[in-house]
Amino acid sequence: MAYGGPSMNPPALSGAVPGSANLKQVKLERESELRIEVSEEPLRLRVVNGTAEIFGSELPPEIWRTFPPRMKFAVFTWYGATIEMDGVTETDYTADETPMVSYINVHAILDARRRFAKASTSNDPESSQGPRVIVVGPTDSGKSTLTKMLLSWAAKQGWRPTFVDLDVGQGSITIPGSIAAAPIEMPLDPVEGFPLDMALVYYYGHASPNMNVELYKALVKELAQVLEKQFVGNPESRAAGMVINTMGWIEGIGYELLLHAIDTFNASVVLVLGQEKLFSRLKDVLRSKSNVDVVKLHKSGGVVARVKEVRKRSRNFKIQEYFYGLSKELSPYANTSSFSDLQVFRIGGGPQAPKSALPAGSTSVSNPLRVTPVNIDDRDLLHSVLAVSYAEEPDQIISSNVSGFVYVTEVNVQKKKITYLAPSPGTLPSKLLVAGSLAWLESV
């Protein structure tokens, strides 16, 4: 383990390496980190000696890793290391004040609770349940980074925790607009991120929960119920518990949705990053729940604030990554189907009840959970990202997860044909597609 014992490797001198203008070595002292923002060009990096990790995953010695443009990360060492970089960064600097000791202490406590749960009898649902950790905090407080660390440290010790991502604005497991869960069987790759092959994905279709709050809550509840059923038949996963990432909207409805998530997933540990006010509110409102610990943690000084335009750009890159790969190494397949071969639906809108059925003076309100068919010849579908639902009937769409996504590149009304990109060739797993407000202008 990177934090399991002192390094026996001798330190190296820092500074530029002769013979290359873009080759640079940095010596890190114990419990310090190298914070990096990659420029518009990829960056190569390796550990020359010592041990170091990124997002809780230890880097192999002497092996170059390539990091994509615009990626932001920190290389941390517990006992000292020398890092070598090849390329130009937007910025890079060392820092010796980090919250990592407090983070690893949280991991140690969670590990003890997992061991207790594993040793307990499976007949006792409460004691056999491992920690269900939910990470909350404002925008750009380091929530995603902390969840990666906790998951990687747990996997390094042989656990198989479940990662749950409720942040529809960015999306860690798959494209934005989704909520998802995935078992983490090994420390996360610092470049590739979360595995998608075993992910359970529900499509919300929007980048913010305020577009349809009731739908967001319904999908969160559906995901929680499915995971609960899986835990019943898998005591090891149950003992490993969950780590849940949340959105950065913590005021008004956003705060209500945080409480809804804490309650729906039966969270036992609430980690609050970067805001005293939120910690105080949650501590007070959860005071009556003796089985819930609310813990305040400092955010890292390396967290980078992102403006609205940067967030939008990040969403577009995530969609591009889904179809083309992180380094554009994939080639999606263009498929053309007749309008009659597919059915597209939106969730929300439509009258909930006719006026004649309402009390005098009342007005009809829209039903946020109504599944409404969409005309495929609607030009609004052009450049849309559509989810391929596992539902067999339209009324099962909300309760069904999705198999993947397609991107609409052309709608030919005259020929009644729709052309879309898909990650794999052949017929789609289902003819039922789900649309939201998520769109993407391809620039590859």
Swiss-Prot record:
Q: Which UniProt keywords apply?
A: ATP-binding, mRNA processing, Nucleotide-binding, Nucleus
Residues bound to ATP: 33, 72, 140-145
Q: What does the record list as GO biological process?
A: flower development; mRNA 3'-end processing; mRNA processing; phyllome development; vegetative to reproductive phase transition of meristem
Coiled-coil portions: none
The answer to keyword GTP-binding applying to this record is no
Disulfide connectivity for this sequence is none
Asked if Ion transport is a keyword of the record, the answer is no
**Gene Ontology cellular component?**
mRNA cleavage factor complex; nucleus
Question: Where does the record place it?
Answer: Nucleus
Q: Name one GO molecular function term.
A: ATP binding
Could you describe the subunit structure of this protein? Interacts with PCFS4 and SYM5. Forms a complex with cleavage and polyadenylation specificity factor (CPSF) subunits CPSF30, CPSF100, PCFS1, PCFS4, PCFS5, CPSF160 and FY.
The record describes the protein's role as: Required for endonucleolytic cleavage during polyadenylation-dependent pre-mRNA 3'-end formation. Functions in gametophyte, embryo and postembryotic development.
Q: Which family does it belong to?
A: Belongs to the Clp1 family. Clp1 subfamily.
Name assigned to this protein: Protein CLP1 homolog
